[in-house]
């Protein structure tokens, strides 16, 4: 050919260049899909050239001696060249945009002599869309021009000589395409060109796994700026995240953009790389939201791979509300230390939490009541008429009161601790049980009270017996008062029948009547109020006559009044004596159904009689105490020493009765007559009392030796020692129950007019059921002019710490001074037997009380109880509560246990705690360490520092829970530190002017 014959060296050099530069071709990009690559064609390309002598296909070898097919044209000598080269038909596949990459060389026209008018340095690129191969004809008019291609660099003859070749690369886009395929065409218009390679491809985003979602191969969009959204498919054992399906966008460049949404491994599977693998044995994953498999919780297992939950071991369960990550649990063990207290037909049960709560914190208690016939050995569930306070099931506290039981009946109570899995367990129930026999109940309320006859000065009443007498009714008590008086003062009438006539009333006055029945178990409740108005005076003549005579002779009126007063006084004294015997003080029963009238300012029917008023002590003791036969008494052992001799325990066996445990006080040998008199005086006092919270006198032995006083045996001894022995072992409600019993006993004594004068925890005895009873009635007390101000007794001195200020200063003993002492007893009980005022001297105690200081609240003492103590310690005795009020307050606390959870600091009247003069001034310390050293607790300095308590201000705000959280486990140390903190807090309040005295 002309081209080859005229410029053979150029062609040869072109081959050399191909061999030299073939290795510089870039590798196929991972995001490109080839449709045509001329370099990959080892055989002839056989493209169509028109005219045939235009473009020429030639061969060469690359560096690997692989044949390479190229086309060249160099028709530069003649003008108006129109040489076409067309590829074979190219199927576009799924492509919408096509990329054409051309690599070529182009000769610089200036380097060719004689071709300045005919040589070109560009060529044109065309394409033609079609659904099939149209054959070998090139229909130029159907082709669409893509672009005119110009070389960035052209080579010269010199480049050939230096073996330098300048390769041009141009890339053009086609699209969007709508047919199945297309042709490419190259138009030469007179250039000297060599097409080294032609590559046709389209771009797509290759399949990837991202966020556990598979995104398939995706062809790019038809436009340069288009984004193709692709929704991913979750890998095996994965699922789409809720409302966040996996999506990605494929860009026009074949690149995946930032993923949106994701897949997550299903329950039982966890992610490992781009896959979800099953949880191994002993592991689980309960939710797809969890990231990793977790080891099975305690007492559970999984025996297969891919577990979404772990099964509980035998005997362990999971409540429906329990999440799968918590340990399997079991029902709790039985409650511990179940104790009971019987008050006629009411039983109080208390217990300690179970030793094993089953691994749960939702332990509650339920009570099962059974009425039993022990002779037949059968028990049946109690009926619905039984009352439970606060409730029968779902109890969160460890106490309950069961009410409305039948009298003289046998009951068994089962207390079961339950938790969230108790109902799932098939095991036998675990419970604590106690069997009891109720006592005699007081009668129920009197009903059907009616007025039978109403006159000017009398009213006749009738009524019906109580529906449940619960024993033999021995008498009825009618209480009446003027309605305007509102029960400030009232009168009582007693009768054995169900009717009575009330005399000596005022004409034209409205009276209120109430009636209650009495049995050996005590009084029942009063009937509803009945208002009755007496008739008006028929005429006023009598009063007029009296008025006239009074004006004429007032001396006569005075004499008449004096005589009448004397007669009334005689009748009142006689009535008191008869009434006392009728109420049970006399050992002989009264005959007849006579009605007795009394008028009192205070409730009650018994009056205490001082044995000292009897000239003969034997007469007093036999008046009030029962003489026992010494043969009925068996002394077993000595348990202590009393003021007059030994105190022993033993048994009392009376004819026809079972033996009972008793305590026996003996009068020592060689006693004086005064000692015998004082010894029997206590029996004369005790014999007048009959109350569940006052120690009961069984009787005396005066006709033999040794002289003995026999009282009921109290198993737990004195209250103060008992509390110290069991420090911290009782609930607040148990302690309040003890206080309530003491207050009830003192209310009874106060109603009888007896002043104890030595009420202290050491003089309170405790039985096996934790019932507290007032004791110690036999001391002779004389206050001496002692600067220490103590009682002097034949047995020793009693500190003034329990005594009211007016009793110390003025020797004025009343029930109000007993109330003061009761407040100290409350403090002793709540502090578990601590000594009141600690190590202060008696003189310091008296001075502090005079200055208005009072004992601070014991540790963990509810605010309401401390407030009651402060009320008992009012300086003005008239402002102190009565024992009747104290019992009512404590009853309300027991009925509403939540009131006992009120934290300290909510009292309506703030106080400053009593401060010992020897107590260090904590406000002068500079550091927590100095304070701890002052109270000899420096061993805990590191504990306070580690917990962040670096200032005394922060320490002053600490609670007992804060102290315990420091790891201080010794109860004594906890109390000492907390007491010091309370004192520090009081000093700080006083320093800033916020603390006040009572």
Swiss-Prot record:
Maturation and modification: Phosphorylated.
Effect of residue 903 to S: In a metastatic melanoma sample; somatic mutation
Organism listed in the record: Homo sapiens
Presence of the UniProt keyword Transmembrane helix in the record: yes
Protein name as catalogued: Ephrin type-A receptor 7
Gene: EPHA7
Residue ranges annotated as Extracellular topological domain: 28-555
Phosphotyrosine, modified sites: 608, 614, 791, 940
Keyword 4Fe-4S: no
């Amino acid at each position: 050919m002309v081209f080859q014959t005229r410029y053979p060296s150029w062609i040869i050099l072109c081959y050399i260049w191909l061999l030299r530069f073939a290795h510089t071709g870039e590798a196929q990009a991972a995001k490109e899909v080839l449709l045509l690559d001329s370099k990959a064609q080892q055989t002839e390309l056989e493209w169509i050239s028109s005219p045939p002598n235009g473009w020429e296909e030639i061969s060469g070898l690359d560096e690997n001696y692989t044949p390479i097919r190229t086309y060249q044209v160099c028709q530069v000598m003649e003008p108006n060249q129109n040489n076409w080269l067309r590829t074979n038909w190219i199927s576009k596949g799924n492509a919408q945009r096509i990329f054409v990459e051309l690599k070529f060389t182009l000769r610089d026209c200036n380097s060719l002599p004689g071709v300045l008018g005919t040589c070109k340095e560009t060529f044109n690129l065309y394409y033609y869309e079609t659904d099939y191969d149209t054959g070998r004809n090139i229909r130029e008019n159907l082709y669409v021009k893509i672009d005119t291609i110009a070389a960035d660099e052209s080579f010269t003859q010199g480049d050939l000589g230096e073996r330098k070749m300048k390769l041009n690369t141009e890339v053009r886009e086609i699209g969007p395409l709508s047919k199945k395929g297309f042709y490419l065409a190259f138009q030469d218009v007179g250039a000297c060109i060599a097409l080294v390679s032609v590559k046709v491809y389209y771009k797509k985003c290759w399949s990837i796994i991202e966020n556990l979602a598979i995104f398939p191969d995706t062809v790019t969009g038809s436009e340069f700026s288009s984004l193709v959204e692709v929704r991913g498919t979750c890998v095996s054992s994965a699922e789409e995240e809720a409302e966040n399906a996996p999506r990605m966008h494929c860009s026009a460049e074949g690149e995946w953009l930032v993923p949106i949404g994701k897949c997550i491994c299903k329950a039982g599977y966890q992610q490992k790389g781009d896959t979800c693998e099953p949880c191994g044995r002993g592991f689980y994953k309960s939710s797809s939201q969890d990231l990793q498999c977790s080891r099975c919780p305690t007492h559970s297992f999984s025996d297969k791979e891919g577990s979404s939950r772990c099964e509980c071991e035998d005997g362990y369960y999971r409540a429906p509300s329990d999440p799968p990550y918590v340990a399997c649990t079991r029902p709790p063990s039985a409650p511990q230390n179940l104790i009971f207290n019987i008050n006629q037909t009411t039983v109080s049960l208390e217990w300690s939490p179970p030793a094993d709560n089953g691994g749960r914190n939702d332990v509650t208690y339920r009570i099962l009541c059974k009425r039993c016939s022990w002779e037949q050995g059968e028990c049946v569930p109690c009926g619905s008429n039984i009352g439970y306070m606060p409730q029968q099931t779902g109890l969160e506290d460890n106490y309950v009161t069961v009410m409305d039981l039948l009298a003289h009946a046998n009951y068994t109570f089962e207390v079961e601790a339950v938790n969230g899995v108790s109902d799932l367990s098939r095991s036998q129930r675990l419970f604590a049980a106690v069997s009891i026999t109720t006592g005699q109940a007081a009668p129920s309320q009197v009903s059907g009270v009616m007025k039978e006859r109403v006159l000017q000065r009398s009213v006749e009443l009738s009524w019906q017996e109580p529906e449940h007498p619960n024993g033999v009714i021995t008498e009825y008590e009618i209480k009446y008062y003027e309605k305007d008086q509102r029960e400030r003062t009232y009168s009582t009438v007693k009768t054995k029948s169900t009717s009575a006539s009330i005399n000596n009333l005022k004409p034209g006055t409205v009276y209120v009547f109430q009636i209650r029945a009495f049995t050996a178990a005590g009084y029942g409740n009063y009937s509803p109020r009945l208002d009755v108005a007496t008739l008006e005076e028929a005429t006023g003549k009598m009063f007029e006559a009296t008025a006239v005579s009074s004006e004429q002779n007032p001396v006569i009126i005075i004499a008449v009044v004096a005589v009448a007063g004397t007669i009334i006084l005689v009748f009142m004294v006689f009535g008191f004596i008869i009434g006392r015997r009728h109420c049970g003080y006399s050992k002989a029963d009264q005959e007849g159904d006579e009605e007795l009238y009394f008028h009192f300012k205070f409730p009650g029917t018994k009056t205490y009689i001082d044995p000292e008023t009897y000239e003969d002590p034997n007469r007093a003791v036999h008046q009030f105490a029962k003489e026992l036969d010494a043969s009925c008494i068996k002394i077993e052992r000595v348990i202590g020493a009393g003021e007059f001799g030994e105190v022993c325990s033993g048994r009392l066996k009376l004819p026809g009765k079972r033996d009972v445990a008793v305590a026996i006080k003996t009068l020592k040998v060689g006693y004086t007559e005064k000692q015998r008199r004082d010894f029997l005086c206590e029996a004369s006092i005790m014999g007048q009392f009959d109350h569940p919270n006052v120690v009961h006198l069984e009787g005396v032995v005066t006709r033999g030796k040794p002289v003995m006083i026999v009282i009921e045996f109290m198993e737990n001894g004195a209250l103060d020692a008992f509390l110290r022995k069991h420090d911290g072992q009782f609930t607040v409600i148990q302690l309040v129950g003890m206080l309530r019993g003491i207050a009830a006993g003192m209310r009874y004594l106060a109603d009888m007019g007896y002043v104890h004068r030595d009420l202290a925890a050491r003089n309170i005895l405790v039985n096996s059921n934790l019932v507290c009873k007032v004791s110690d009635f036999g001391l002779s007390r004389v206050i001496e002019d002692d600067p220490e101000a103590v009682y002097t007794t034949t047995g020793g001195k009693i500190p003034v710490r329990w005594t009211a200020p007016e009793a110390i200063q003025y020797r004025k003993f009343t029930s109000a001074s007993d109330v003061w002492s009761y407040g100290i007893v409350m403090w002793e009980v709540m502090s578990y037997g601590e000594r009141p005022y600690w190590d202060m001297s008696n003189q310091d105690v008296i001075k502090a009380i005079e200055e208005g200081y009072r004992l601070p609240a014991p540790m963990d003492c509810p605010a309401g109880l401390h407030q009651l103590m402060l009320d008992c310690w009012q300086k003005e005795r008239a402002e102190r509560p009565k024992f009747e009020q104290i019992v009512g307050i404590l009853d309300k606390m027991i009925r509403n246990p939540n009131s006992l959870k009120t934290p300290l600091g909510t009292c309506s009247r703030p106080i400053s705690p009593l401060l010992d003069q020897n107590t260090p001034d904590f406000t002068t310390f500079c550091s927590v360490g100095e304070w701890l050293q002052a109270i000899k607790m420096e061993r805990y300095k590191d504990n306070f520092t580690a917990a962040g308590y670096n200032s005394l201000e922060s320490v002053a705000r600490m609670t007992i829970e804060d102290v315990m959280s420091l790891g201080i486990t010794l109860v004594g140390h906890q109390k000492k530190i907390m007491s010091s903190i309370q004192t520090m807090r009081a000093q700080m309040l006083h320093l800033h002017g916020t603390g006040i005295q009572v």
